[in-house]
Amino acid sequence: LVIRRQRQMCIRDRPYCSLPELEACMEVWSFMEMIHSRSYTYVIKNVYPDPSEVFDKILSDNRILDRAATVTESYDEFINEAHQYDTGNWWKDGWRDHVSGKLERKEIKRKLYRAVANVNILEGIRFYVSFACSFAFGELKMMEGSAKIISLIARDENQHLAITQNIINNWRKG
């Protein structure tokens, strides 16, 4: 669920990216998330005799949905705020320097910062905690194929962490 939302994030925030390098990076990130989603599907299909039960439960389990919401809520807030700005009048020449227009842009930036910080936490902490069990199976010589897949996903998530940290550090510099 979070993987699918991350792919959507990469696609939805592209209009708000002003650097071609970062836009290309997001494109690659989105592709990686698609591969991760298919990899998780492969692992589940090889562990459960009836994987449809697992897939169906994911979208109805409140604990899973609540956990995903903690990650995606700030991103949705940013997208909604940015969309409101785009469809309003604040960006037009006459309103650009108006106090309300400046406050609106500041709020969009605050929500974007919060969204990227949440993705940073997801990539840097939450994914690694969820990988621990798979790594343990691999060390015990059990489910080694799945552990290898998860280790490749962890490598990608480490790249995503570096990207979000770089973005945050560049914003901090001004």
Question: Predicted regions: what is each one?
Answer:
Residues L22-E23, S37, F127, M143-A147, ...:
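Internal amphipathic alpha-helical segments of the cytochrome P450 catalytic fold
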Residues K57-L140, N158:
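All-alpha helical catalytic cores of prenyl diphosphate-utilizing isoprenoid enzymes
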Residues S30-R38, N120-I125, S151-A162:
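Generic structural signal for well-ordered, non-transmembrane alpha-helical segments
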Residues D13-A24, I44-F55, K102-R114, A132-L152, ...:
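Inter-helical turn/loop segments and adjacent helix faces that build the functional surface
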Residues R12-R96:
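Long, hydrophobic, well-ordered secondary-structure blocks that form the structural core
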Residues L1-I11:
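Single conserved hydrophobic/aromatic residue that forms the stacking wall/gate
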